[in-house]
Amino acid sequence: MSRCLIIINPVSGGGAARRYALDLQWKLSTLFETIEVKFTRGEGDATRFAKNACERGFDAVFCMGGDGTVNETVNGIAQGGFSCTFGFIPVGTVNDMSRALGIPQNPTQAIRRIDINETRTIDIGRCNDRYFCNNIAAGVIPKVVDEVTPKEKSILGPLAYFLRA
């Protein structure tokens, strides 16, 4: 029996992730026999959910959110032994990894493009006890990312990071 976990950050994209959740669930239900959906409520949830799914033998973990949700999910899969296929739908402010991979920024288009038979291998790095898949930053960048509020991201979009710097 093929199983897939969907992790949704309901505040990503000003609540856009919640709006597209059913579309993603429907699409993945055509590819997997069992779908489980979990909504994050705070920091660390996506990591915990992904790790648990891998440990329970799920075939895939998809997340819907921004770069932070993607990073947390990748960390959970890594901690779970890299045993799951990973997919994501970009619904954040910047969506850096999806841009690098050529994934459509429009969630509907990204969902339509999901094909479990067309996967790619991506490199995963590790720094201390954290994993990363797209970039790693030091100095002012992580400080700025931490300081930008969800309200600022919602109102200003990517400009919020520039103004905080």
What are these regions (language model features)?
Residues 59-64, 68-69:
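A glycine-rich beta-strand to alpha-helix segment
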Residues 10, 64-66, 91:
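Glycine-rich beta-strand-to-loop/alpha-helix junction loops that act as flexible
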Residues 1-61, 75-76:
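ATP/NTP phosphate-donor binding region
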Residues 31, 79-165:
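Catalytic core of DAGKc-family lipid kinases
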Residues 46, 68-73, 96:
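Short glycine/serine/threonine-rich phosphate/pyrophosphate-binding segments
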Residues 12, 70, 93:
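Short, glycine/acidic-enriched loop or turn micro-motifs at the edges of active sites
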Residues 42, 65-66, 137:
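Helix N-cap/beta->alpha junction signal
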